[in-house]
Curated annotation (Swiss-Prot):
This is CDK5RAP3 protein homolog. The keyword Protein transport does not apply. Keywords: Ubl conjugation pathway. Belongs to the CDK5RAP3 family. A motif (Shuffled ATG8-binding motif 3) lies at residues 333-336. Substrate adapter component of the UFM1 ribosome E3 ligase (UREL) complex. Interacts with ATG8 family proteins. One of its GO terms (biological process) is rescue of stalled ribosome. A motif (Shuffled ATG8-binding motif 1) lies at residues 274-277. A motif (Shuffled ATG8-binding motif 2) lies at residues 285-288. Substrate adapter of E3 ligase complexes mediating ufmylation, the covalent attachment of the ubiquitin-like modifier UFM1 to substrate proteins, and which is involved in various processes, such as ribosome recycling and reticulophagy (also called ER-phagy). It comes from Arabidopsis thaliana. The shuffled ATG8-binding motifs mediate interaction with both ATG8 family protein and UFM1. InterPro entries: CDK5RAP3. It comes from the Eukaryota.
Amino acid sequence: MPSQDDVQNLPIDITFSRLGEWLVDRKRIPADWRKRVAVIRVKILKEFSSLPKEIDPFFQTLDPEVIGYLEVKKVYEILLKTTPESRNIFGRLSGASGVWEAIVRAFEKDHIYLGEAAQIIIQNVNYEIPYLKKQVQKVQQQMTELDRKEADIKRSVALSATKYEDACRELGLQGNNVRRELLETASSLPSTFSKILEVINSDSVTGAMEYYSAYVQDVHTEKDKPLRIVLQNLKYIRENPPSLSVFGDSEGLDADNIQSSENANGTDAAADSIDWDITVETPEIDWDVSMVEEVDSGNDLGSYEIVNASDIPENSPFKVEESQGLEVDVSEISWDVSVETPQVEEIGDSALLESNQTQLTDSTTQVLGSGGERSQLLETEYRNKILDDLYEVKAFLNQRLIELRNEDTLSLQHHVQAVSPMVLQQYSPETIEPMVVDISMAISLLTNKKSRDLIMILNSKRFLDRLVSELEEKKHREVKLRESLKDVGRRRMELQNSLSAIWPKQEAALSKTRELKELCETSLSSMFDGRPVNIRGEINTLLNAGVSA
């Protein structure tokens, strides 16, 4: 049988969630303790307004709605220290100290404060502290996601900046004023065209053309049949090199459109000022001649003139496509019109017109270069025909390299080479390789993105607008991403402020719960003659987690 000392040392374990019921069941507090606590709170609210808050900073942090026994006791202790002389003739405290002493005594009567402490503990452990913990975790998770988002945005900013710089570098731009720089870069096209013609007229390309022609003549031409003509377009561009000027009608530059408009207006004005003394009735004459728009070549006919089919070279490979619909026998048409140039007296208007046209031409050629004829290399069909021949020669040379280096057919190739004409025997792999390099260079100059874009800029205003829009969109994306970085910074500041507001509340709830637990255990232990009292349950896990955190 356990002794009295053993019984005295046995602990009393109480589950925190049933602490209030346990106190009532064992008659430690009255059953109507809630009503009595409500009465005390009414008195606290009444007296709190008259509390001298300037005495201690603690008073300014109090919320009258949540003041409990611990806060009331601390207020009483502060007032007792600051106003020790506030006592009446009977030795009792008077004024604010006496009022708050009465409130403390009301809490301690019948141990009402234990019921309030049990209620606050259950409220904090089950609801308040878990809610605050979830809020803290939520804010911390949002900050983690924000850090990841910021890292992604920074990578995107760097990538966008790199893409914009690469796009500008590819076009030879600095990126300050894209539209103006694109138009200025168009001045590099004549030098590009010059390099293309230089490569096409080089010795290695000449040798490649001769090698291909001789090979076709030897291998693919039958006896008693005419020789097969190859590489007509390359031969034509070598014999008739196109103009290097990019001057001409272009949608890409407004100055050209203005010039065309001014030319047309000027021609009309000149025509109105001259009496040609010719009456033309359109319904009675069938001209049967197509009208094509050409650049004014200085013959005073304006922007439109009749194309003479005899002006096209006989050996041009482009004659068929460009002269369709113009096969007219001029000698069979009797115009029956006699034109006499009368004396023109309005010299002043003519001189003014020529001066205006000269100014427009000078301003346009600053970007496009001088020259009366627009380069044929600006035309897609013309370039495609040149490329067809270049690709044909390149494919032939690559195939010959494969055949000459194939060890399985090397003996056969030597035999074929021995019976071939002397002109074909001089070409070895070492001779063919430089030809392939130069042919590839010519193809690259014609097909690289910068050349194609600059040609399209001169040929189409819409393409220029689209290209400018694409470049500006890349730059705008970088700016937009940098703005989003600022938004991320502002959001982080908001989360930090929110965390700074929640964290003290959580710590205060944990601290108050710990104090109330110790208060209950100490008070109950004194009621049971010093037997140890332990409040068990989730409260300990929560408080220990708070300490470790």
